[in-house]
């Protein structure tokens, strides 16, 4: 993939960009083999790739510059701003949004936050696009609520320019630290969630719910999990760290009892909305800590699916799963190193199959799906 920002030395986020996609996949596969060395794997599935560019459904832009000439992108360690509007990872549909937002910031008087001076209001712009219908969600991350009245007053102009903006919010992040968002979310539109659809499964994206940034590969990941579960005798399933319910909603059948657990209430609201649309009455989603939920249960499901953050599921949950011994565990991971550590804490399981998903092209990162069967 060609990138003018990389060629000019202005951005190095895509550290593997000079390698071909095949070379990248080979290196990632070798890394996964190395991490699982000593753990017998019955079946290595062919890695799944996706588009080289224009695949991201989300932009996270630091806002710098002035209110008259804002700049969207990132800041180097020395404070030098870099305009990332031309990043080739973004779809072409993002360009007109960035173009309209620059004069809008002046209209609304949203002075970009100056890190060195600790002054200004607008810290970040967070933009998400639905692959289903092209609808978008835009979040203004502000230092305070000072400019909310001006922001609301200027919004009709922006919505006239960009009718694809379905969900608009102001997120309040008052701390002088490189934290992307705060706890307070103020909705500026009647619609609170962005509609998405993977493999004919309705999904919803809310401002403070995690959602995969590579929808092409994510849809194949969910479809693969559904295929694997469909081949197993599963009537009762837990979906831990479930997010908006992508895995559970794909895997569930009308006959299956499924409980999805996620600590973020916004994500659980999305999952419940999808389950209601699908008419799946035996799906139950709860906003709880996954480890605390699992270890408090007195029953053993047929299958436990885990999709933890990069830190993995950890030894306490591994020990509990080893104790209750569900027949199957499906582990989806964005950090194969912690996944391998966790699997080594499950000695009464064998790895039946492993498949790599290239969710993050041009970087060393990847997603991996692993099926574990009880010995």
Swiss-Prot record:
Its EC number is 2.1.1.189. S-adenosyl-L-methionine binds at residues 212, 241, 262, 307. PROSITE patterns: SAM_MT_RNA_M5U, TRMA_1, TRMA_2. The gene is rlmC. Catalyzes the formation of 5-methyl-uridine at position 747 (m5U747) in 23S rRNA. GO terms for biological process: rRNA base methylation. The active site is at residue 334. InterPro entries: 23SrRNA_MeTrfase_RlmC, MeTrfase_TrmA_AS, MeTrfase_TrmA_CS, SAM-dependent_MTases_sf, U5_MeTrfase_fam. Keywords: 4Fe-4S, Iron, Iron-sulfur, Metal-binding, Methyltransferase, rRNA processing, S-adenosyl-L-methionine, Transferase. [4Fe-4S] cluster binds at residues 3, 11, 14, 87. It catalyses: uridine(747) in 23S rRNA + S-adenosyl-L-methionine = 5-methyluridine(747) in 23S rRNA + S-adenosyl-L-homocysteine + H(+). It comes from the Bacteria. GO terms for molecular function: 4 iron, 4 sulfur cluster binding; iron ion binding; rRNA (uridine-C5-)-methyltransferase activity. It is an enzyme of class 2 (transferase). This is 23S rRNA (uracil(747)-C(5))-methyltransferase RlmC. Pfam families: tRNA_U5-meth_tr (PF05958). The keyword Magnesium does not apply. NCBIfam families: meth_trns_rumB (TIGR02085). The keyword Ligase does not apply.
């Amino acid at each position: 993939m060609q990138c003018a920002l990389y060629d000019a030395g202005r951005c190095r986020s895509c550290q593997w960009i000079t390698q071909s996609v095949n070379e990248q996949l080979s290196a990632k596969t070798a890394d996964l083999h190395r991490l699982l060395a000593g753990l017998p794997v019955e079946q290595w599935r062919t890695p799944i790739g996706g588009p080289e560019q224009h695949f991201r459904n989300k932009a996270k832009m630091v806002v710098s510059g002035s209110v008259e000439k804002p700049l969207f992108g990132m800041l180097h360690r020395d404070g030098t701003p870099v305009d990332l509007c031309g990043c080739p990872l973004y779809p072409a549909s993002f360009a007109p949004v960035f173009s309209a937002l620059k004069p809008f910031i002046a209209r609304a008087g949203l002075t970009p936050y100056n890190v060195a001076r600790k002054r200004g209001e607008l810290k970040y712009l967070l933009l998400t696009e639905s692959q289903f219908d092209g609808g978008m969600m835009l979040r203004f991350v502000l230092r305070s609520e000072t400019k909310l009245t001006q922001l609301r007053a200027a919004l009709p102009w922006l919505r006239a320019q960009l009718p694809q903006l379905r969900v608009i919010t102001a997120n309040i992040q008052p701390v002088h630290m490189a934290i992307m968002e705060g706890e307070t979310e103020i909705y500026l539109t009647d619609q609170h969630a962005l509609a998405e659809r993977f493999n004919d499964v309705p999904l919803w994206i809310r401002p403070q719910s995690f959602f995969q940034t590579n929808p092409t590969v994510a849809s194949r990941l969910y479809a693969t999990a559904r295929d694997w579960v469909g081949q197993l005798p599963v009537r009762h399933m837990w979906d831990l760290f479930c997010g908006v319910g992508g895995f559970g909603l794909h895997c569930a059948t009308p006959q299956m009892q499924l409980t999805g657990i996620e600590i973020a209430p916004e994500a659980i609201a999305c999952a419940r909305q999808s389950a209601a649309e699908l008419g799946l009455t035996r799906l139950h989603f709860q906003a709880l800590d996954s480890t605390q939920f699992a270890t408090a249960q007195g029953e053993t499901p047929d299958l436990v699916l885990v999709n933890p953050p990069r830190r993995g599921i950890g030894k306490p949950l591994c020990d509990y799963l080893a104790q209750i011994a569900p027949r199957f565990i499906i582990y989806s991971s964005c950090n194969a190193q912690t996944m391998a550590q966790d699997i080594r804490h499950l000695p009464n399981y064998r790895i039946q199959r492993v498949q790599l998903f290239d969710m993050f092209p041009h970087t060393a990162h990847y997603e991996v799906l692993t099926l574990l069967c009880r010995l």
